[in-house]
C-alpha cells in the first residue's frame, strides 16, 4: 500500500527557510528535544513545515556541533578512501567526519573533490608534445628501419595480433605472398648491402635457463653455371651441455627440413625476391653475437 504521508502537503509551506522559522525550530529542539517523532514536531513547534523538512533542516544546518567551511586535507583523504571502498554512501562517510553532514560531503564531492581527483590523474599537457618531439627527432636510418620492420612483421587478422617468430616462419613456408621479418631487439639490426637475405628469429625457449635464439637465412649461392639453394641456420646461445637441450635443437632442425622440402628452388627464390624488390638492403644480426653456424644443403 505504500508509506503514509508524513503531513498534509496541501497545507505545508515549501521553499527556503526564513530566519524566523530557523529560530523557532532551534529553540524548540533545544528545550524539548525531538521527542523521536518528526511528524508531530512541526505542529508542536508552531511551524507550517513538513516533518521531513524540519529533520533535514536541523541535521544539515541548525544542530550546534555542525561544521561548515572548507574541508581539510585529512578530511579529503578520508573521503577518498571511503568512497573507494563503499561508494557514494554519504551518510556512512559523514559518520566518520565529525561535524560534517552527508549533504555537505555530497555537495563538496560533486563540486570540488571529484574534479580535483580527475585533474591529478590526467597526464600533463606537455606529455603528448614531448612524445611527438622525441619521435620527430629520431634519426632517418632508425625511422626507416622501424617502418620496414612494422610493414614486414607477421600479422594474424583472425586474432588481431602479431604472430610469434615460429608462427611467422610456418606461415611463410605455407605459401604467404609477403616476406615476414621479426626482430626482438631493434638495436641489433644493421644494414648488409652484399646480399638479399631472409632473416627470421625462432621463439625463445622459456623453459630453459640459457638464452636460445636463432635465425633462418635463405640465400642464393651461385657457383659457375649451377645454383645451389642454401639454408643456413645461425645459432646464437650461451653454451649449454645439457642433453635435453641438444635433442630439442635436433627436433627443431628436422622440422624445418621437412617444411623446406615441400618447396622447390624457384618458389623459394620468388618468396625472397618479392620482399626485396623495394629495397636492396637486408637485415642482419650483430656478428659479434654469433658463436657457431650449422650448414644444411639441399
From Swiss-Prot:
SUPFAM superfamilies (alphabetical): Homeodomain-like (SSF46689)
Consequence recorded when altering residue 256 to S: In strain: cv. An-1, cv. Ct-1, cv. Cvi-1 and cv. Wassilewskija
Name this polypeptide is given: Transcription factor RAX2
Keywords on record: Activator, Developmental protein, DNA-binding, Nucleus, Repeat, Transcription, Transcription regulation
Chain's gene name: RAX2
Distribution of this protein across tissues and organs: Ubiquitous, with higher levels in roots, flowers, and shoot tips. Found in all cells of the shoot tips.
Function: Transcription activator. Positively regulates axillary meristems (AMs) formation and development, especially during inflorescence.
Pfam families (UniProt xref): Myb_DNA-binding
Amino acid at each position: 500500500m505504500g508509506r503514509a504521508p508524513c503531513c498534509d502537503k496541501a497545507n505545508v509551506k515549501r521553499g527556503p527557510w526564513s530566519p524566523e522559522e530557523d529560530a523557532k525550530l532551534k529553540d524548540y529542539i533545544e528545550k524539548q528535544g525531538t521527542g523521536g517523532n518528526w511528524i508531530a514536531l512541526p505542529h508542536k513547534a508552531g511551524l507550517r513545515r513538513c516533518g521531513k523538512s524540519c529533520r533535514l533542516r536541523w541535521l544539515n544546518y541548525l544542530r550546534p556541533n555542525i561544521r561548515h567551511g572548507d574541508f581539510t586535507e585529512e578530511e579529503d583523504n578520508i573521503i577518498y578512501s571511503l568512497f573507494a571502498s563503499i561508494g557514494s554512501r554519504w551518510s556512512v562517510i559523514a559518520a566518520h567526519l565529525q561535524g560534517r553532514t552527508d549533504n555537505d560531503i555530497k555537495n563538496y564531492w560533486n563540486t570540488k573533490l571529484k574534479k580535483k581527483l580527475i585533474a591529478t590523474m590526467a597526464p600533463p599537457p606537455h606529455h603528448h608534445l614531448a612524445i611527438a618531439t622525441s619521435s620527430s627527432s629520431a634519426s632517418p636510418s632508425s625511422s626507416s628501419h622501424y617502418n620496414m620492420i612494422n610493414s614486414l612483421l607477421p600479422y594474424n587478422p583472425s586474432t588481431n595480433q602479431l604472430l610469434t617468430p615460429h608462427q611467422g616462419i610456418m606461415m611463410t613456408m605455407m605459401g604467404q605472398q609477403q616476406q615476414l621479418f621479426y626482430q626482438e631487439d631493434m638495436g641489433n639490426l644493421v644494414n648488409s648491402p652484399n646480399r638479399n637475405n631472409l632473416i627470421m628469429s625462432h621463439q625463445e625457449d622459456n623453459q630453459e635457463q640459457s638464452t636460445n635464439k636463432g635465425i633462418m637465412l635463405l640465400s642464393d649461392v651461385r657457383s659457375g653455371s649451377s645454383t645451389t639453394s642454401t639454408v643456413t641456420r645461425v645459432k646464437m646461445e650461451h653454451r649449454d651441455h645439457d642433453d635435453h637441450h641438444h635433442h630439442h635443437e635436433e627436433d627443431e632442425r628436422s622440422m624445418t627440413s621437412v617444411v623446406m622440402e615441400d618447396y622447390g628452388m624457384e618458389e623459394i627464390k620468388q618468396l625472397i625476391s618479392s620482399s626485396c624488390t623495394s629495397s636492396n638492403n637486408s637485415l642482419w644480426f650483430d656478428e659479434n653475437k654469433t658463436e657457431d653456424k650449422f650448414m644444411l644443403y639441399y
